[in-house]
Amino acid sequence: MPRTLFHDIDPARVRANLEEVTGEAAGRAEVLVACKYVPVEEMGALVEAGVGLVGENRQQDLAAKHEAHAADFTWDFIGNLQSRKVRQILPLVRLIHSVGTDSVLEQLGRHGTAETEVLIEVNVAEEEGKGGVAPAGLADFIARCPVRVSGLMTMPPFAEDPEASRPHFARLAELAAANDLERLSMGTSQDSRVALDEGATIIRLGSALFA
């Protein structure tokens, strides 16, 4: 994924790419447009392209973009979640995809409401140094979450071959079923088709839509 901001976004190109992906996902998954690398002044191009659901990775960028386009999109938070940012993020989003630490649970207990809904990030591959709850501890973590948990999210180890993600996505689907959870946020531009095969209900796309 590019690490520089997208400029001069072509709404027609985004619309065409989005329509193709939405057609593939129809009846199975929502298409979330990851806007981490979209500057606030380019968000209007996403409006013009017909984007409805966006995900942001940083609290500060979420606040700035939401202020400019609050009513234009449904907003999710998909980035690394710092406990000290929970209070600022909650009022702006439909879902937080990345709950995975006890300190975040504490802040959700303080600032969550009856409407708060989250996904638990699961470190399915149990990679060292990577965020998320280990599969063995998932049921206990869900039980301790003070707000509604509606699903799970994962980021599998990066691999050139999208098929390498399949066992990790399949495992997340098994964990969701075992815990009676409906939402599965998995799959990015690189492996979204595999994620759809394995039951994703939200796929998170960025560079694939802007190219």
Name each model-derived stretch:
Residues 1-190, 196-198:
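Conserved alpha/beta-domain cores
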Residues 193-197, 204-211:
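Expand to "…catalyze enediolate/carbanion chemistry for C-C bond making/breaking, isomerization
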Residues 55, 203-204:
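Paired acidic/hydrophobic, glycine-rich loop segments that form the ligand-binding mouth/hinge
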